[in-house]
Structures are given as structure tokens and as C-alpha cells.
């Protein structure tokens, strides 16, 4: 399409008037901005270094990953996996302390009179009582193994957790591990943290852990105690799981 000279002049005049209008909208110092039709940042060739294969974090920042370029510290996936929620840890420790009390027969629990009378009859039937005497001496030949076996025969399954307490009521014999409690709780916390780090948190069993830690501190539990957690394939699973956890902690493991 051809344009006449008059059309060209009109277009030129229109553009000049538009430019003058735009310039009037800016302060004098800002008019230079209109001189730039377009702008692009200069291209600089930057050679990006390769990220290190392993993060070299200071010992005080264990569990944190530092961004190679930004320097920002953040928790990595491994660190998150190893953390145990404070409330969950308190709950586990509370259950562990309950297990220690039951092991020593000092838990707050009332044994029904029927259970004790049934046990007395069963003990007599097996000639385990000392005749002619009363009190604790009467049951001095009764062991925890007897109590556990008789409870099973009598089908008092709700009392399996109270074997040590019942044995104490009958014989006045009690296990004392109060001198180990502080170390046991410390080791228990380490085990729970390692279990979560090893993705074995679902295998935490406070009774099993208690008996393993008692062995670690030279106080092996009795047979009836072990039987309450080591039954069939479940006990084997506990052994396999905690063998890995002990290896992670650098402890020597022996099955129950």
C-alpha cells in the first residue's frame, strides 16, 4: 500500500506530539529512561563448580545440611528421620518406667483375692507349701516360674503382667534395680532414637528392651519375664530388629 507525502508528514507529526506528551509526564531527570528502547543484562560466562559429594558440616551442626551456594542451613531427610517427637519420647519413657516398676513388683496394682486363693490351692496341690507355718515362709519354695505356670493353668491371663508382684506378695522376695534405673533410661532413649533412624520404630517393645538392657548391665532377667515377650516368631522378629539397632549404636547384641 503506497503512502503519499502528506500522509507521511501527518504520521510524523502525530508521533512527535505523542512523544512530547510522554516526556511531559516525567521529571527532567527521569526523561533519560525513555531513551532506552530495550535493555538486557550483560551475559557473563560463569563456571559453576560441582557440588561436593559429601557435606562437610561442623560437629556442632550435626544433622544440618548447608546449601553449597546459599550457605543456608536446613534439616536433611536423614536428620528428620532420626528425630523423635518430644511428646512421643516422653510417652515411651513413661511406659519404660512402668515396665521397670512391674519388673521390681512395685507397681500400683491390687491383686484380686480370688487370684491369690486359686494360687494357694494350686500351690498346695503341687506340695510346694511349707506346712505348719504361716506368712512368707509358707511359700518360700515358690518361684516366679511356678507363679507364671499356675496363672497360665488357672487362665488368669490378665495377671501375666503382675507375676513379679504376686511372687513378692507370697514370698516377700523382690528384685531391686533402682541403682540401674538412670543408666537404663539413658540407654532406652538412645535405642528409641536409633530405632526411628533405622526405620524400626514399629518394633519398639518396652519389656523386650528392658530385658535386653538388663543383660547389657549384667542383670539377666528370669525365664518367666523373657517368655512374656519372646513367643514364637514374634520373639525372633524382635531379635532380628534389635540386632540392627545394637549394631547402629555400636553395642554387642545377644538374643534373649
Curated annotation (Swiss-Prot):
Task: Decide whether keyword Transcription is in the record.
Answer: yes
> What biological-process terms (Gene Ontology) are attached?
regulation of viral transcription
* UniProt xrefs under InterPro entries: Poxvirus_VLTF3 (IPR007031)
Enumerate the UniProt keywords alphabetically: Activator, Transcription, Transcription regulation
Summary of the function given for this chain in its UniProt record:
Transcription activation.
Can you name this protein?
A: Putative transcription factor 001R
Organism, by scientific name, is: Frog virus 3 (isolate Goorha) (FV-3)
Amino acid at each position: 500500500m503506497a503512502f503519499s507525502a502528506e500522509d507521511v508528514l501527518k504520521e510524523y507529526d502525530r508521533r512527535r506530539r505523542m512523544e512530547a506528551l510522554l516526556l511531559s509526564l516525567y521529571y527532567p531527570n527521569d526523561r533519560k529512561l525513555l531513551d532506552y528502547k530495550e535493555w538486557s543484562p550483560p551475559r557473563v560466562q560463569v563456571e559453576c563448580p560441582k557440588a561436593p559429594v559429601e557435606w562437610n558440616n561442623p560437629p556442632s551442626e550435626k544433622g544440618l545440611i548447608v546449601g553449597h551456594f546459599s550457605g543456608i542451613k536446613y534439616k536433611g531427610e536423614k536428620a528428620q528421620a532420626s528425630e523423635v517427637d518430644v511428646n512421643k519420647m516422653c510417652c515411651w519413657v513413661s511406659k519404660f518406667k512402668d515396665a521397670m516398676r512391674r519388673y521390681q513388683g512395685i507397681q500400683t496394682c491390687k491383686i484380686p483375692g480370688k487370684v491369690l486363693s486359686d494360687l494357694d490351692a494350686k500351690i498346695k496341690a503341687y506340695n510346694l507349701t511349707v506346712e505348719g507355718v504361716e506368712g512368707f515362709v509358707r511359700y518360700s519354695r515358690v518361684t516366679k516360674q511356678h507363679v507364671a505356670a499356675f496363672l497360665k493353668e488357672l487362665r488368669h491371663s490378665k495377671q501375666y503382667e503382675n507375676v513379679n508382684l504376686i511372687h513378692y506378695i507370697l514370698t516377700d522376695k523382690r528384685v531391686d534395680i533402682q541403682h540401674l534405673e538412670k543408666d537404663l533410661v539413658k540407654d532406652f532413649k538412645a535405642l528409641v532414637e536409633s530405632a526411628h533412624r533405622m526405620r524400626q520404630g514399629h518394633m519398639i517393645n518396652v519389656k523386650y528392651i528392658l530385658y535386653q538392657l538388663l543383660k547389657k548391665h549384667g542383670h539377666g532377667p528370669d525365664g518367666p519375664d523373657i517368655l512374656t515377650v519372646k513367643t514364637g516368631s514374634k520373639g525372633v522378629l524382635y531379635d532380628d530388629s534389635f540386632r540392627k539397632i545394637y549394631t547402629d549404636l555400636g553395642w554387642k547384641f545377644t538374643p534373649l
